[in-house]
């Protein structure tokens, strides 16, 4: 019977305690989505044990027609958000790049107000999903350093 203690694996924390501090955040593209991502990633923490990062993000939003009905009217749109993220770990002077994509479906409406409200709700959900994925990716990168 063998017991493997101290095998070298670390438990990845998926909690609210962040191990990084964003010093500089640059964004290009859709300002609403980028603002939501920035708000979720940038926190004012003055802990000395945090790793300082510069984050640059380029967000592209595509709205494609997904379905049409018999009378050739649009019934569904597909919203695709793609974010290209560049992270610079200031202490190590290492740069990492990755791309995160998320998509959602929007039902067309005759009322423009309802369509805009539904579109903004879906984009907010997609931005929150992307910021959570970016956060997990940053945490994974910093755990590997």
Predicted regions and their residues:
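Surface-exposed short loop/turn segments
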Residues: 39, 49, 53-124, 132
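Bacterial Sec signal peptide processing site at the extreme N-terminus
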Residues: 2-24
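Compositionally biased, intrinsically disordered linkers/stalks adjacent to structured regions
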Residues: 11-14, 18, 119-145
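Short helix-to-loop capping/linker segments positioned immediately adjacent to catalytic or ligand/cofactor-binding
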Residues: 44, 71, 141-142
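N-terminal secretory signal peptides
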Residues: 31-51
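Post-signal peptide N-terminal segment of mature Sec-exported envelope proteins
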Residues: 17-37
């Amino acid at each position: 019977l063998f017991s493997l203690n101290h095998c070298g694996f670390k438990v990845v924390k998926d909690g609210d305690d962040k191990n990084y501090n964003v010093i500089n955040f640059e964004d290009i593209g859709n300002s609403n989505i980028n603002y939501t991502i920035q708000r979720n990633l940038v926190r004012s923490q003055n802990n000395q044990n945090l790793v300082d990062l510069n984050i640059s993000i380029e967000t592209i939003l595509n709205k494609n027609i997904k379905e049409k009905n018999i009378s050739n009217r649009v019934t569904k749109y597909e919203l695709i958000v793609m974010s290209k993220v560049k992270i610079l770990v200031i202490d190590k002077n290492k740069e990492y790049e990755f791309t995160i994509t998320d998509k959602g479906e929007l039902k067309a409406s005759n009322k423009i107000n309802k369509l805009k409200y539904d579109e903004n709700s879906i984009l907010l959900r997609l931005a929150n999903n992307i910021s959570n994925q970016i956060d997990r990716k940053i945490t994974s990168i910093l755990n590997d350093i």
